[in-house]
Amino acid sequence: MTTSAQSVLELLPAVDIVDGQAVRLLQGEAGSETSYGTPLEAALNWQNDGAEWVHMVDLDAAFGRGNNAALISDVVSQLNVKVELSGGLRDDESLERALELGVARVNLGTAALENPEWTRKAIDRFGDKIAVGLDVRGTTLAGRGWTKEGGDLWEVLARLEDAGCARYVVTDVTKDGTLQGPNVELLRQMVEKTGKPVVASGGISSLEDLRVLRELVPLGVEGAIVGKALYAGAFTLPEALDVAGRR
């Protein structure tokens, strides 16, 4: 890999799904949805604008009220980009179903906190197709739709490192959907404690935020999930890709 390639911040525009619609939540709270049309329209929009990844979240599955698996399967089949899927992956059945949809990677959230032995086996079985989403409030992890505490971040990280986790998606839940800027200090602490790639999520509001995150790429920040700022028109995806070094 060349030096220039190493300085590229991978962008993952988000498509959050509730009841078959693409939505954005404020700080992950059910009932705070703003609708943005169909998931396929949203994902194709990002693909056409130059994305190589889409971060898709089945919020119904995350909140334990059914799932959008059939819809997601249809969307993935019509895309040429890689899809990272999150939401409601808590057992072998849901994990296998998600991977069978054709996604490139899945994010384990609550299950990684509540069932560490199952998580270890999933990582052993599927390797770098598994990322673990760490949703953080201070240094306390939030579980199950961000409504319950899930333990100390550094204790859980040590356990996941021991299990061989390949990648972490780190969200400061106090920032998510707020356009208040990412938690750079949290990301710095994360990359200091793991040699694995870290994907940043939550709070990205401006091209300047992306410039700051790109400076962390040599330290181990691999990418950034961008949601509300794109939907709200703070910047376009092509503009963001320019700043991230991809175009």
Swiss-Prot record:
GO terms for molecular function: 1-(5-phosphoribosyl)-5-[(5-phosphoribosylamino)methylideneamino]imidazole-4-carboxamide isomerase activity; phosphoribosylanthranilate isomerase activity. Keywords: Amino-acid biosynthesis, Cytoplasm, Histidine biosynthesis, Isomerase. Pfam families: His_biosynth. It catalyses: 1-(5-phospho-beta-D-ribosyl)-5-[(5-phospho-beta-D-ribosylamino)methylideneamino]imidazole-4-carboxamide = 5-[(5-phospho-1-deoxy-D-ribulos-1-ylimino)methylamino]-1-(5-phospho-beta-D-ribosyl)imidazole-4-carboxamide. It is an enzyme of class 5 (isomerase). One of its GO terms (biological process) is L-histidine biosynthetic process. It comes from the Bacteria. Gene3D superfamilies: Aldolase class I. The active site is at 16 (proton acceptor), 135 (proton donor). One of its GO terms (cellular component) is cytoplasm. It is found in: Cytoplasm. Pathway: Amino-acid biosynthesis; L-histidine biosynthesis; L-histidine from 5-phospho-alpha-D-ribose 1-diphosphate: step 4/9. InterPro entries: Aldolase_TIM, His_biosynth, HisA/PriA_Actinobacteria, Isoase_HisA-like, Isoase_HisA-like_bact, RibuloseP-bd_barrel. Its EC number is 5.3.1.16. Belongs to the HisA/HisF family. This is 1-(5-phosphoribosyl)-5-[(5-phosphoribosylamino)methylideneamino] imidazole-4-carboxamide isomerase. It comes from Paenarthrobacter aurescens (strain TC1). The lineage of its organism: Bacteria, Bacillati, Actinomycetota, Actinomycetes, Micrococcales.
